[in-house]
Structures are given as C-alpha cells and as structure tokens.
C-alpha cells in the first residue's frame, strides 16, 4: 500500500475553518483578508495550487509566494507572520502557508 503524502492527507480533510484551498493567488488584498482571518482566530493553513474540489493543479510560478508576502506586508497591521513550504506532489508543486494565531487586522 502506497503511503499518502502529508499534503494529500490535508486535502482529504476538505476545507474547514483552519484549512483553505486556493487555485492561485491573484489578489494580494483578498489574500491579506484570509491571512488576517486565520491569524485572528485559531490560525490555519492555505494550500496554494489546490482547487476547491481538492484536485491539485500546482502553483505556476514563484510569484505566488511573493504575492502572499506582499499581502502580509502591505495590507495587514501588524504584518502577519507565516511559514511557507513547497511540496512536490505527483509532479506538481503545492505551496503550504501556515499562519499561527496572531492578533492583527487587514487594511
């Protein structure tokens, strides 16, 4: 039996209060609201490169990471700290963004 990748195990849980799937990052202000929402509650994870139905599409460029970084720096006060990890799953890259509980607000 093939062992499940940790990201596949997260995806299998489906989206919930602490887990959100994003096909892509196209709007820094919108992502800032998501970062802020996670930070102001119990924290959470964003999986970038995963469609709402759980299918892995993969991230298309380094730009995804930089848009998240820009969202935190430009649109949240104080800046929301996050950790990002790139995972290779079946030849596609998924960007996992972990946001810990942290009181802030989005602009």
In which residue ranges do the predicted regions lie?
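Conserved N-terminal catalytic/coupling substructures associated with nucleotide/phosphate chemistry
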Residues: 1-107
């Amino acid at each position: 039996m093939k062992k499940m990748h940790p990201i596949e195990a997260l995806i299998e849980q489906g989206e919930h209060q602490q887990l959100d799937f994003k096909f892509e990052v196209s709007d820094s202000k919108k992502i800032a609201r998501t970062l802020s929402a996670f930070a102001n509650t119990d924290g959470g994870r964003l999986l970038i490169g995963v469609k709402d139905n759980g299918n892995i599409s993969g991230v298309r460029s380094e730009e995804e990471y930089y848009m998240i970084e820009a969202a935190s720096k430009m649109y949240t006060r104080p800046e929301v700290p996050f950790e990002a990890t790139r995972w290779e799953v079946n030849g596609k890259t998924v960007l996992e963004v972990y946001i810990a509980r942290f009181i802030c607000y989005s602009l």
